[in-house]
A protein has these predicted regions:
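Short, cysteine-centered beta-strand-loop-beta hairpins and adjacent loop/turn segments enriched
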Residues: 141-151, 180, 330-341, 372, ...
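Fungal secretory targeting signals
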Residues: 1-20
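Solvent-exposed beta-strand/loop surfaces, strongest in extracytoplasmic domains of secreted
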Residues: 704-807
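A hydrophobic membrane-anchoring alpha-helix module
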Residues: 177-180, 185-225, 370-372, 377-427, ...
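Short, low-complexity N-terminal intrinsically disordered segments enriched in polar/charged residues
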Residues: 20-50, 54, 58, 62-66, ...
Length: 807
């Protein structure tokens, strides 16, 4: 059987690459527990932040272990790193009191108050025994009391977590404050001094340690899971990845007002709800809601960004539906009339999986507005919406987090076989489960590395982020081009940003540019060894003064990362590493905190306006790369118009409020639609079209699929030869994205995958296959569903197409 020989080849590759020892039920059980732990820790921290929005202090405190503590650096002492002046509170009861007191009237409960708490960009480190963990996060709070007072606080968490019984708890929440201020004046460095590097709990090498296969480790205490339970739980993780990607992709389409792509993501009766007003089901209802944001496409001066933060996902036990919950902050503006808005929304979206194709779609986008404010007036006085006299009711929290003290089982006991790609002979099940688990851990390892990079670049630690790259990995230096290898990346960075950046323990810095790498869409290869990442770069910063010059960094810039990551074997170690790092920036920026992204006029009521600030990276650069040419220049003619308008690219340059093109590494995840206007740049790394030997596929890695494999199927009744009589001719056409090759066999079955096999056919070069079925094989007078299955290959996803036939 050709079909299974394809699968076997893949399985062997995985076994060789990722496991020294054979995959067993025990090793899978242990690895699964590790990955589920990493996810639960993220869910704990993200839900903690979600609870703050609604002043649920008791529940927030219930996430702490009984002897867990909170240390909240006050930043008034000699040194932010010095614990001695940090508030130190132990135990859930005292922590609840502290949280409540700290929020005061800015608790999200008082009429007009706002308590937005963001925790993002996690680097999670699980201990070897799987019982404790550390996590670094960005933390940012936008708060207001509705009566004119506001607070902004930003900094870094270096937290610790412990497995207590069945659940992960916070054992230490350690906050290092870096900047603070108010809506009126913006923010600046706490203490008005230079800021140290907050110690990292990881090294570049450690940041890439795979989650799985941590041998030797403690012997498993519990019993091993059954194969069925493993299938169930691993499938749920795989599906969770798809859901998260879909929600985050939707956000990017909304930002660019790509309404056709947004609508493609919905079921035929999909809806959008805002504050419980729900659109009529279907495309026209969706279109009318989307049109309220404006017509399709962005024109000069329009900002429609909706960054998505701290998404948590809960799968239904049957794996056919899911809820995604999180925070979306609309940053809306029209530069032409100098108007802008903040829109703080909780979302709680419902998604469903099409059981036929296994493709996830949106059933309902559901937004509950926390607060909407004009940029000029801000959120301190309650904004313009919603007018609310009583405290808001939070949309339900996920994953049993509303009662975190109770010992809820971490996963349902029941199971159902949810293998996306059909059934395999038992002997192939365990290696295939290992591959599926690796695909999900690739998601978290990619986020880990992405976040680790984000923190290092904030602190401009050249050698540290150089070392996050693979030996043959490459990184773009904005406006210049790509440098390949950790040492060349490090040298380029130091040449550009100056010698202080090479020191592991640099002097305090007057200003820090923050790179929030959030809203990740991670496309994982079939074997789980490589991934393609799209991420938002929401750049902000802090400085000594909030209101002047470069140090007046309390504004925002927007960019997009297009990266790839690989599992590299080097000097006997296996590590997840950055293969390719590319940033397209800046799509927009705030001239200052005062004026925001739409040049809002706040001069009458606020502090003096700040001088217009050009690209932050450029300003910060103190050196020059003239004597250190890149391996690939963004001026390379082979890029064509790819970098036209971007800093360093071919003229004319395009800067906000003009609109730069936005590029895509994937097709629409539901419809397979290819982004128009030459903005599709996939598959493969951005500089790969200039350097084909940089393609993953030329380096022993698989290129992740860029979207669904679509199968359209036709059936016609034709005259067979005399002996057979009439036949049903079934024709299938398979398609994926440009430059994605479909090859292999397709099967025709009557009904589902375990039902009758009616034929197996090799695809032709155009992706067509045709089957001839004797009419007598189908029940006369009855509709038969004929299904064409494709197992996928190392470049494209599996697919399924069906046709109903009445003979
Ligand atoms: C907290 O309690 C756990 C279990 O009782 C114990 O293992 C741990 O050492 C304690 N932590 C601290 C900081 O006391
Ligand atoms: C949408 O349509 C599907 C299929 O017809 C149906 O099962 C489902 O109940 C509908 N959902 C809503 C919210 O109308
Ligand atoms: C500015 O233009 C937008 C449309 O882009 C409109 O919605 C908004 O009301 C206008 N604001 C002002 C203050 O005129
Ligand atoms: C949207 O969310 C609100 C608030 O949680 C809820 O009351 C409403 O039922 C949801 N709407 C849909 C269509 O799910
Ligand atoms: C939480 O769970 C515990 C233990 O199951 C139970 O005693 C308690 O009443 C629950 N609390 C809430 C608010 O549901
Ligand atoms: C993240 O990096 C740490 C080292 O800092 C490593 O131990 C851990 O396994 C990685 N976690 C994930 C989720 O990749
Ligand atoms: C910060 O502001 C003070 C006045 O408030 C000014 O003297 C100082 O030069 C400013 N520093 C910077 C770095 O702009
Ligand atoms: C199905 O039939 C229609 C009409 O004859 C034709 O346009 C289309 O190309 C066919 N599709 C396939 C997959 O054969
Ligand atoms: C597959 O089809 C067979 C035969 O029609 C049926 O008995 C079986 O329940 C189906 N299985 C699933 C998972 O739908």
């Amino acid at each position: 059987m050709r079909l299974f020989s394809v699968l076997t080849a893949t399985v062997l590759l995985v076994t060789r690459a990722s496991a020294q020892s054979p995959v067993t039920i025990e090793s899978l059980t242990e690895d699964l527990a590790r990955l589920e732990s990493v996810r639960e820790i993220k869910n704990v921290q993200r839900t903690f932040a979600q609870l703050a929005h609604y002043g649920r202090f008791q529940l927030m405190a219930s996430f702490f272990a009984d002897n867990g503590s909170l240390r909240w650096g006050a930043g008034t002492g000699a040194n932010i790193l010095d614990d001695s002046d940090a508030a130190a509170i132990t135990g859930p009861a005292a922590i609840e009191t502290w949280l409540r007191t700290d929020a005061g009237k800015m608790d999200g409960l008082q009429p007009g108050s706002l308590n937005t708490w963001i925790n993002e960009q996690p680097v999670i480190t699980l201990s070897a025994d799987g019982k404790s963990a550390k996590g670094r996060w960005h933390c940012l709070r936008f708060m207001g009391d509705g009566k004119g007072s506001s607070r902004i606080e930003g900094g870094i968490f270096e937290n610790q977590y412990a497995l207590v019984g069945e659940r992960w708890k916070i054992s230490l929440m350690r906050y290092y404050p870096l900047y603070a201020g108010s809506y009126r004046d913006g923010w600046k460095n706490v203490g008005g001094k230079g800021l140290p590097v907050i110690p990292y709990h990881y090294t570049p090498d450690e940041a890439g340690i795979p989650i799985l296969n941590q041998k030797p480790s403690a012997a498993p205490e519990g019993k091993s899971l059954s194969p069925e339970e493993l299938v169930y739980r691993i499938s749920q993780l795989n599906e969770e990845d798809e859901v998260r990607n879909l929600v985050h992709s939707m956000g990017y389409y909304v930002d660019r007002r790509m309404w056709d792509d947004v609508i493609d993501l919905f079921t035929p009766n999909g809806t959008i709800s805002v504050d419980s007003n729900t659109s009529p089901p279907g495309a026209s209802g969706l279109q009318s809601v989307l049109n309220r944001m404006g017509p399709a496409g962005l024109t000069r001066g329009i900002l429609n960004d909706h960054p998505i933060y701290q998404t948590t996902v809960e799968l239904a036990p049957d794996g056919l539906s899911a809820i995604a919950r999180g925070l979306e902050i609309g940053m809306i503006g029209d530069h032409a009339n100098r108007s802008a808005q903040w829109q703080f929304c909780t979302f709680r979206h419902t998604l469903v999986r099409d059981p036929d194709t296994s493709i996830w779609k949106i059933q309902n986008l559901n937004y509950s507005r926390l607060l909407v404010a004009e940029y000029a007036a801000g959120w301190a006085s309650g904004g313009i919406l919603p007018a609310r006299a009583s405290p808001p009711t939070p949309p339900a929290f996920l994953l049993g987090f509303l009662n975190y003290s109770s010992s809820v089982p971490r996963r349902p006991e029941s199971w159902s076989p949810l293998l996306r790609e059909g059934v395999h002979p038992t002997s192939e099940l365990l290696p295939d489960l290992a591959r599926r688990l690796l695909r999900s851990s690739s998601f978290d390892e990619t986020e880990n590395l992405s976040s680790a990079y984000g923190f290092y670049i904030d602190d401009v630690r050249c050698s540290l982020f150089g070392d996050l790259h693979a030996q043959k990995g490459f990184k773009a230096s904005p406006g210049i081009g790509w440098y390949r290898s950790p040492s060349r990346i490090t040298t380029a960075c130091a040449a550009r940003y100056g010698p202080n950046t090479a020191s592991l323990n640099p002097a305090p810095r007057g200003s820090i540019p923050f790179h929030w790498r959030i809203q990740l869409v991670v496309l994982t290869s079939h074997d789980g060894r490589s991934s393609t990442l799209r991420g938002r770069n929401l750049q902000t910063g802090t400085g000594l003064n909030s209101t002047s010059g470069f140090s007046g960094l309390a504004g925002f810039n927007g960019g997009i990362y297009h990266d790839q990551m690989v599992l590299e074997e080097h000097e006997g170690k296996t590590r997840r590493k950055i293969w390719s790092l590319t940033i397209d920036e800046f799509y927009w920026n705030s001239a200052s905190w005062g004026t925001g992204w739409a040049n809002v006029d706040r001069a009458s009521s606020l502090s003096p306006l700040i001088k217009r600030r050009s690209a932050m990276e450029k300003r910060q650069a103190s050196g020059s790369l003239e004597n250190f040419p890149p391996d690939v220049s963004i001026k390379d003619p082979l890029f064509g118009t790819r970098y036209q308008g971007f800093m360093g690219g071919p003229p004319p340059s395009v800067s906000w409020p003009n609109i730069l093109p936005m590029y895509w590494e994937y097709r629409n995840p539901v419809s397979g639609r290819v982004p128009s206007g030459g903005t599709y740049w996939g598959p493969g790394c951005v500089p790969c079209r200039v350097k084909p030997d940089w393609f993953l596929t030329n380096n022993g890695y698989e290129e992740p699929a860029t979207g669904p494999t679509l199968i359209s199927v036709n059936a016609t009744i034709a005259k067979g030869d005399g002996e057979i009589g009439d036949v049903v001719v079934v024709t299938a056409k398979l398609s994926a994205g440009p430059e994605e090759t479909i090859w292999g066999y397709v099967e025709l079955r009557k009904g589902n995958r375990s039902a009758n096999l009616m034929g197996e056919v090799l695809l032709d070069n155009e992706g067509f296959a045709s089957f001839t079925v004797p009419k007598g094989d189908l029940k006369a007078g009855q509709v038969s569903q004929l299904v064409v299955y494709y197992a996928g290959n190392d470049r494209v996803k599996p697919g399924r197409g069906a046709v109903d036939v009445l003979v």
